[in-house]
Amino acid sequence: QECIRAKSPITAENAINIGITGGGVIDGSGDLWRPVKQFKLTDRQWEALMKKSQYTIDTKEGGIWMPTESSFKGNEHNIQLDAENALEKASEYYDFYRPVMVSLRHCKRILLDGVTFMNSPAWNIHPFFCKNLTVRNVTVSNPYYAQNGDGIDVESCKKVHIHNCTFETGDDAICLKSGKNAVARQIEGPCEDVYIHDCLVNKGHGGFVIGSEMSRGIKNVLVENCTFLGTDVGVRMK
């Protein structure tokens, strides 16, 4: 389901034969974007955040720190894509609409190899309706308190091979999705033919997760020889 987001710093759409490879580090400066829940931090960590920004939201779980005035007001207004003049209205609250760090949409023959992806504003890697995707020898790292800090969210993709990767995230590590609600079901596109093996998840909500957005279906998936050490749940079906 389409939604309002800031432009991803790394984006490809309708591209063929693309790769992000090598031993480098891609840092998304997520601390400048992400809200932080107070209960996930020590008192000293919370005090340090409050010196950077005084904007907070009160909830039953405690406070949520917002990094900027724009993100704080964006949360209040929460403009959705189906609103009249939505993009124009949302631009005033740009910081609220956190981007995924790597967005790959309708691409074919993709290789991610050897790179470290870290500190993303929202999800780290989001392949969407892609075909022939290989992710190997990749490290994905986010702080344990990173809100929506998923490792990789493979959505409605075909022929996916993820192996020998290491994840440490603030949310789900390896996640398969296929769209949300009736809007998603208008377009055929299950997530299918996925092979995941020899991956290590040091920390995260779920090590390997299906859902929660799965309206177009998920099929033909094999996960083996993976190690989940510090996850809340190893394998999770939402």
Language-model features: locations:
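Extracellular/periplasmic carbohydrate-active domains that bind, remodel
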Residues: 1-238
